[in-house]
From Swiss-Prot:
<dbReference type="InterPro" id="IPR001010">
    <property type="entry name" value="Thionin"/>
</dbReference>
<dbReference type="InterPro" id="IPR036391">
    <property type="entry name" value="Thionin-like_sf"/>
</dbReference>
<keyword id="KW-0800">Toxin</keyword>
<feature type="signal peptide">
    <location>
        <begin position="1"/>
        <end position="28"/>
    </location>
</feature>
<dbReference type="GO" id="GO:0005576">
    <property type="term" value="C:extracellular region"/>
</dbReference>
<keyword id="KW-1015">Disulfide bond</keyword>
<dbReference type="GO" id="GO:0006952">
    <property type="term" value="P:defense response"/>
</dbReference>
<feature type="disulfide bond">
    <location>
        <begin position="31"/>
        <end position="68"/>
    </location>
</feature>
<keyword id="KW-0732">Signal</keyword>
<dbReference type="GO" id="GO:0090729">
    <property type="term" value="F:toxin activity"/>
</dbReference>
<feature type="disulfide bond">
    <location>
        <begin position="44"/>
        <end position="54"/>
    </location>
</feature>
<comment type="similarity">
    <text>Belongs to the plant thionin (TC 1.C.44) family. 4 C-C subfamily.</text>
</comment>
<dbReference type="Pfam" id="PF00321">
    <property type="entry name" value="Thionin"/>
</dbReference>
<keyword id="KW-0611">Plant defense</keyword>
<comment type="function">
    <text>Thionins are small plant proteins which are toxic to animal cells. They seem to exert their toxic effect at the level of the cell membrane. Their precise function is not known.</text>
</comment>
<protein>
    <recommendedName>
        <fullName>Leaf-specific thionin DB4</fullName>
    </recommendedName>
</protein>
<feature type="disulfide bond">
    <location>
        <begin position="32"/>
        <end position="60"/>
    </location>
</feature>
């Protein structure tokens, strides 16, 4: 009975990490000419405008790949954002949303081992699995 709970915990962890990875990859999908264009795009999109409409109105492009063209250097991340901060928040968020929920469901010595594995998986995911775009052109 205990091994099946452990397997369920790992499967849930992997599924939720997959969802988190999808959200992380969405971050750099719009590229803008400059900071003014980026601010315009963010304001438009926050106000409810669709991504294509906001991109067209604000001199931005919607891209499908991970890197912006050289003439559209500004990504969705703020200029003062840095990879260490993003990695730290990713790890904290992953542990809080995935590992803490597992701890609430199952209790016991085996769960402590699973929590350690979950924390390690979050750290590996946030350090290696996430694609962080540079904000410098």
């Amino acid at each position: 009975m205990a091994p099946s709970k452990s397997i369920k915990s790992v499967v849930i962890c992997v599924l939720i990490l997959g969802l988190v990875l999808e959200q992380v990859q969405v971050e750099g999908k719009s590229c803008c000419k400059d900071t003014l264009a980026r601010n315009c795009y963010n304001t438009c999109h926050f106000a409810g405008g669709s991504r294509p409409v906001c991109a067209g109105a604000c001199r931005c492009k919607i891209i499908s790949g991970p890197k912006c063209p050289s003439d559209y250097p500004k990504l969705n991340l703020l200029p003062e954002s840095g990879e260490p901060d993003v990695t730290q928040y990713c790890t904290i968020g992953c542990r809080n949303s995935v590992c803490d929920n597992m701890d609430n469901v199952f209790r016991g010595q085996e769960m402590k081992f699973d929590m350690g594995l979950c924390s390690n998986a979050c750290a590996r995911f946030c350090n290696d699995g996430a694609v962080i775009q540079s904000v410098e052109a």
